[in-house]
């Protein structure tokens, strides 16, 4: 009886998955939302029945995707199903929401790397080159318009953009990581919104103000900073490693800085509007980002929160 229930539930969830997949492939705009929701059937089934049952669902979903007849369908199925099963397994084990987010990001990243390699090896398509060519054409069109309007500095601006464009191939690892994180984050938001209504037990997301990155990141940041001062030759492996790690670590330090600002405002009972305004302003005022990043570094290295909390309790 229990086995029959599992099969029936699996069939129903596969039906929902195929519907979501078809909407993703053929319905504009709404397809973006259904694309992010593709993980949901796998999360629900695995959270209720375990990862072994989830693997069977991956296999069947893959076969059905092939039967649909589109390589894109299979390319969408593999990341969604594998990430969904991992998320469902961690939910079943009452995993922390940050752990679930990190695991989903890792699974999506592996899938994106695999897709990139397959595209180059089997189809001779380099997505970076395609993207660069599209951007280059857009820049040239903008230059032509600016020149026709009498903009004298158009060529200088285009030269700067062309130089920046050359770094996109070096930053491929960073782009893959950030894309994987964004995909995992929004998929998780949609998933948890739905599964709560299906009475699947999930742990709440810890407040952003409680985010505390490991202290070891400071050592990595220091090592990367020293390596960047050594100015490795452009195009070398060391150059790519330093460039990507610098970007990712600076981003993490900035996030830690924002977290501290939210924490400080919470402890001091300052309106949430203040930290939210700072986040918005940081996208508009570049020097503000440097200050927030420095706050993040100090927060990790010198345990600012403990000092503030101690002073607050002493009052």
Protein language model annotation of sequence segments:
Residues 198-252, 256-257:
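Small-residue-rich helix-loop
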Residues 1-19, 146-154, 221-233:
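Membrane topogenic helices and adjacent juxtamembrane segments
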């Amino acid at each position: 009886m229990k086995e029959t229930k599992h099969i029936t539930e699996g069939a129903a969830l596969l039906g929902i998955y195929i519907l979501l997949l078809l909407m993703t492939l053929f319905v504009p705009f709404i397809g973006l939302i259904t694309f992010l929701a593709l993980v949901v059937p796998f999360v629900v089934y695995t959270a209720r029945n375990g990862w072994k049952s989830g693997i069977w669902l991956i296999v069947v979903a893959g076969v059905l995707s092939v039967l649909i007849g589109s390589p894109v369908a299979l390319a969408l199925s593999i990341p969604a199903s594998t990430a969904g099963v991992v998320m469902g397994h961690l939910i079943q084990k009452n995993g922390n929401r940050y752990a679930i987010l990190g695991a989903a990001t890792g699974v999506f990243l592996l899938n994106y790397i695999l897709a990139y390699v397959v595209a180059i090896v089997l189809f001779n398509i380099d997505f970076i080159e395609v993207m660069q060519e599209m951007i280059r054409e857009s820049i040239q069109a903008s230059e032509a318009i600016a020149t026709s309007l009498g903009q004298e500095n158009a060529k200088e601006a285009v030269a700067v953009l062309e130089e920046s464009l050359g770094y996109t191939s070096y930053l491929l690892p960073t782009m893959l990581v950030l894309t994987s994180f964004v995909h995992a984050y929004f998929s998780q938001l949609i998933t948890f919104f739905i599964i709560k209504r299906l009475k699947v037990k999930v742990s709440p997301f810890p407040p952003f103000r409680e985010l505390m990155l490991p202290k070891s990141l400071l050592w990595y940041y220091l090592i990367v900073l020293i390596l960047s001062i050594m100015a490795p030759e452009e195009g070398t492996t060391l150059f790519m490693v330093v460039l990507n790690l610098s970007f990712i670590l600076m981003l993490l330090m900035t996030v830690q800085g924002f977290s501290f600002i939210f924490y400080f405002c919470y402890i001091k009972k300052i309106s949430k509007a203040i930290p939210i305004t700072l986040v918005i302003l940081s996208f508009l005022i570049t020097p503000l980002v440097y200050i927030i990043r420095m706050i993040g570094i100090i927060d990790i290295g010198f345990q600012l929160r403990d000092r503030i909390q101690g002073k607050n309790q002493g009052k």
